[in-house]
Amino acid sequence: MAAAAPVAADDDERRRRPGAALEDSRPQEGANGEAELGELSRLRAELAGALAEMETMKAVAEVSESTKAEAVAAVQRQCQEEVASLQAILKDSISSYEAQITALKQERQQQQQDCEEKERELGRLKQLLSRAHPLDSLEKQMEKAHEDSEKLREIVLPMEKEIEELKAKLLRAEELIQEIQRRPQHVPSLHGSTELLPLSRDPSPPLEPLEELSGDGGPAAEAFAHNCDDSASISSFSLGGGVGSSSSLPRSRQGLSPEQEETASLVSTGTLVPEGIYLPPPGYQLVPDTQWEQLQMEGRQLQKDLESVSRERDELQEGLRRSNEDCAKQMQVLLAQVQNAEQLLRTLQGTVSQAQERVQLQMAELVTTHKCLHHEVKRLNEENQGLRAEQLPSSAPQGPQQEQGEEESLPSSVPELQQLLCRTRQEARAQLQAQEHGAERLRIEIVTLREALEEETAARASLEGQLRVQREETEVLEASLCSLRTEMERVQQEQSKPQLPDLLSEQRAKVLRLQAELETSEQVQRDFVRLSQALQVRLERIRQAETLEQVHSIMDEAPLTDVRDIKDT
């Protein structure tokens, strides 16, 4: 019995030892479960933080998209305002050109009036020149009269000498007459020397008493008759000399009527010697000295007028030549400026085309980055959904396991407990690795999104810089247009109407080219806005998609590589 008692005690002791071991292992398992639960809660907290960070990244992406849309809208508004301002400037320039055209038309009318006045002045000058031809004829007449007067002097000088000789003979005859009168046999009709003048006019009656004297008186009577003949010839020559000299004719005709003057002139002309009568040539006439002096004064005045008119004509011709030279120089300068402006416009067009190409390339890059972002968002959504799907099954078996753990008893053996611990550790390690992998992926996505955001900001800055450059180019173009406008105003004032349509057509062509460039820039901006709107619509559709099939169908649609795709869709 004593031996049996120790054996039983040993058996009881052996039975008690596994129970004690089980009782000792239960606190360890509880501690391990609590640690695993803490690790799971920590992992859940990290997952919640990662999800919250992903939501914040989505919010940041939405904010960036909204800011991008606002920036695009602001750029569009600014471009529209600039286009409106350019259109207003073009309208103002067109109205100013029309006003300049009307002013040039008025100036042309004024120039036509001035030309008509100048033509009238030239007609008057031609009339004066035509009046100058009679002046030449008067000068010729004066020269002819001078020559005739010289010839008359050549004729009159010997006649004057002969008259002097005849006067001497007349004095001798008067002395002889006085001697005869002193004699008692004198003739009663010869009492005065004043009767010699009627003898000179009618010499035949007085010759009868002279014949009587020649018959009765001898040599004295013959001498007296000879002297009477000489006196008759002298009286006739004296009358002829009175008619020939312009100074003695007015004195002898004072106090006579016009008929008596005409009769006296005819008588004196009849008594002239034929060689002494001056007959003017045909087409010429004799004029008095006063009229001759008046004609000379008029000729000198006309000569002065002719000289002044010729000087004015020379000055006008010189001014016209200078104005033509100035106009030619100004035209050359204007052509050079127009060529420079065209070259500047071509360079500006090249820069604008290059800027448009750069903008198109940047738009293509933005489209590609947008597609990449769409793919990344799609992948993130898929991973998020996968993580959620993994989390739900992992959380779902925990409840039954806890209930089963509560309901069922702990493992009865140490190997089972060790296997359970290894299994739980492996599960916890796998969950930790999955969470770390997800967190790493989220970090990578955050970095990529930040890089994409930085690229978008850089693209926006480059677009703003290009817009600033285009503004500067438009300002330079406006300045060149203003300078061209001023030059055109200055040149249009100096040119005639036939050159105005060409310049106007050139300016209109330039305006049309500028309008076409503005329309192309507006079209590019509208296409950019449409493309961004279409991309935003697709992104919103991807966000609102509930299944992966819808996302795949949206992403499998035609890529937005051209604006025509937007118009077709």
Swiss-Prot record:
Modified sites of kind N-acetylalanine: 2
Signal sequence extent: none
Compartments, as annotated in UniProt: Cytoplasm; Early endosome; Cytoplasm, Cytoskeleton, Microtubule organizing center, Centrosome; Cytoplasm, Cytoskeleton, Cilium basal body
Major localization class: cytoplasm
Coiled coil: 34-184, 292-391, 423-523
Region feature (Disordered): 1-38, 181-267, 388-414
Highest taxon, organism lineage: Eukaryota
UniProt record similarity statement: Belongs to the rabaptin family.
Role of this protein: Plays a role in membrane trafficking and in homotypic early endosome fusion. Participates in arteriogenesis by regulating vascular endothelial growth factor receptor 2/VEGFR2 cell surface expression and endosomal trafficking. By interacting with SDCCAG8, localizes to centrosomes and plays a critical role in ciliogenesis.
Protein name per the record: Rab GTPase-binding effector protein 2
Provenance organism: Pongo abelii
